[in-house]
Amino acid sequence: MNIMEIWRYPVKTMAGERLQRARVDPLGIEGDRVVHVEDAQGAVVTSRSHPRFLGHKGTLSPDGEPLVDGRPWRSPEVAAEVMAIAGPRAKLVRYDGVERFDVLPLLVATDGAIAAFGHDHRRLRPNLVIGGVEGLAEREWPGGCLRIGKVLIGVQDLRLRCVMTAYDPDTLVRDKDITRDIYRRFDGKLALNCFVIEAGEIAVGDEVRLARGRACAESTAAAVFGEP
């Protein structure tokens, strides 16, 4: 198996950027979801309720500054567009704590499951796409670990999918049947919720090895519970 794609979403709930290589730290891919949208009451706003955000793209500049459609995230133009979508006083906020993730820091998809899904895999918003995986083999991975060079990733469970899968990433047209199909054929779950056990650098093409057994279980427990 190998890494086919690496994705980062610097602005939570907007479209992301495809990378050739990335640093993986304890909170996932460096620079992922470091900015989010808040409404006038300070609540986090996502494309589940405001899908127009999917039509904007978040990236990082060479110096690590978040951009929205190529513009500084603090610019007046970006601020106006955010309020136009999410309402008066809605704004972008920078925050890099663990709470910025809906579930876990990494979402891993596989080519076999994507083929079974049969639609644009960007609807799944993965961080990593792993190639060389037969069919729905990923569904047997929870409890295991993925070794990518120096990086070790723990696989917790399958991701329960939400309404965002219904939106075409290019046209933003909503097709509820796609989300219904995920629930009908895959019990509502596609791709894997993962966390980082050992940090390091990864790149497209890197070999990925699935590990199981005691060593993986001990590493997983240490990462989750802080055990020595």
Regions found by a protein language model. Give the residues of each.
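Metal-cofactor-dependent catalytic cores
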Residues: 1-228
